[in-house]
Design a protein with these regions (language model features):
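N-terminal single-pass transmembrane signal-anchor helix
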Residues: 1-20
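Short, well-structured segments within or immediately adjacent to enzyme catalytic domains
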Residues: 28-264
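Conserved acidic
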Residues: 3, 7-8, 24-27, 47
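Hydrophobic alpha-helical segments, especially transmembrane helices
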Residues: 9, 21-23, 41, 185
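Aliphatic-rich helix starts adjacent to a transmembrane/signal segment
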Residues: 18-32
Length: 264
């Protein structure tokens, strides 16, 4: 009898695991669609201006238009990790989408310990740095000459359906509100490609969620193992504070193609 139960468990458990993964993927897509709709509603009520991906380097007056404030890590003393009143509820998108659950992928199980209790972190999503930039300005420490989109009408190339806005970021590389797609190597020098601090999440079987300016969302399966380095729960990635060469990485190329274009 015990042997029969063991055999049945061996047959059923993988199927249950796949069903759970599929359900999480569906919820992830729904979260992205809801938050992207809030992003579009904000723009439509702000004379077409989109929110900033991160704070400006010196002008704090722009902070109210930053999509989310605060830097995440695994320190329980850092309230931005676990207190939504400091970040999520202060987001300019909150009034259009007043739900805490949509900010976090259901596959993200990262926590911080606060006075002996494990609390979930408030978000897993980040915004493309090329959608809004640093208070509307371009990044200064990466290859210059790439367009920062500041309004919906700016997104003519690659176009709304081909420009990703939100992405689920790996828990060990999650930091400020933007996701930094380094455009180095695009389109004709793939041997110089690299990650700049940020890595996409792969919570859905080597795949992660994204949403695009036209409102649709996708689960993208990553194909290069370098996009998915070993993760130690509760610890910052050693890649988080450095540029990491990743020549001819098809995942970087995919993100670059859907991030921005050269300024003209």
């Amino acid at each position: 009898m015990i042997a029969i139960v063991a055999i049945l468990a061996g047959l059923l458990l993988p199927g249950l695991g796949r069903a759970k993964q599929k359900a999480q993927g569906i919820q992830c897509l729904n979260n992205h669609r809801q938050l992207l709709l809030a992003w579009r509603m904000y723009a439509e009520e702000s004379r077409d201006r989109i929110p900033y991906a991160s704070v400006h380097g010196s002008d704090r007056s722009r902070d109210s238009a930053v999509w989310v404030l605060g830097q995440l890590d695994f320190d329980g003393a850092n309230r931005f990790n676990w207190d939504p009143n400091l970040s999520v509820r202060k987001s300019p998108l909150w009034k259009y989408c007043p739900s805490l659950t949509v900010w976090r992928c259901p596959g993200d199980r990262s926590t911080v310990t606060v006075t002996g209790r494990k609390l979930p972190r408030v978000r897993s999503m980040t915004m493309s740095v090329w959608a809004g930039g640093y208070g509307g300005e371009a990044p200064q420490d990466l290859d210059s000459g790439w367009r920062v989109y500041r309004s919906l009408v700016d997104m003519q190339d690659p176009g709304p359906s081909g420009t990703w806005i939100l992405i689920d970021q790996r828990e060990d590389s999650l930091n400020i509100g933007n996701f930094y797609t380094d455009m180095r190597g695009y389109p004709d020098a793939p041997e110089t490609m690299r990650f700049a601090y940020d890595y996409p999440a792969s919570y859905h079987g080597r795949a992660g969620g994204l949403s695009f300016a036209d409102g649709h969302s996708e689960i993208r399966r990553w194909v290069d193992p370098r996009t998915m380095p070993t993760l130690t729960p509760g610890q910052r990635s050693r890649f988080n504070a450095e540029f990491t060469p990743s020549p001819r990485n098809a995942d970087i190329r995919w993100l670059q193609e859907r991030a921005t274009r050269r300024t003209r």
